[in-house]
């Protein structure tokens, strides 16, 4: 009987630890890395398909209460710029600046290029 009790505690402890969840990531990376990789490889995936994948990723992340990673909105803005959607481009760049203030100089630079303010 005395051997049974410690064994039971050990087994129940192992079962409970097996049910524990792993650490949560800071950002929802979902499809973002794959989309960027395809874009950099010059994959035949169209810009619209990349935008759709990133927008879906953003919706899923917000539904789960997770944040998208740094560069997400900047990349989405650059995809919008390729389609000539200036309002969406600016909105994404501003969102990137707001969420990640350290990106402000680069986002300002990209917005100034769009306006033709750089030489």
Where are these regions (language model features)?
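C-terminal motif of bacterial Sec signal peptides marking the signal peptidase cleavage site
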Residues: 15-18
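Bacterial signal peptide processing site
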Residues: 20-23
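Residue signature of alpha-solenoid helical repeat architecture, marking inter-repeat boundaries
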Residues: 25-29, 67
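Structural register within alpha-helical repeat arrays
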Residues: 75-76
């Amino acid at each position: 009987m005395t051997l049974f009790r410690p064994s039971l505690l050990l087994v129940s402890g192992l079962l409970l630890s097996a049910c524990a969840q792993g650490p949560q990531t800071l950002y929802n990376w979902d499809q973002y890395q794959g989309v960027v990789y395809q874009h950099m490889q010059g994959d035949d995936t169209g810009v619209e398909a990349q935008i759709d994948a990133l927008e879906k990723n953003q919706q899923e992340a917000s539904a789960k209460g997770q944040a998208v990673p740094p560069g997400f909105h900047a990349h989405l803005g650059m995809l919008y710029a390729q389609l000539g959607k200036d309002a969406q481009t600016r909105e994404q760049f501003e969102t990137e600046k707001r969420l990640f203030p350290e990106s402000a100089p680069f986002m300002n630079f990209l917005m100034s290029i769009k306006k033709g303010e750089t030489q």
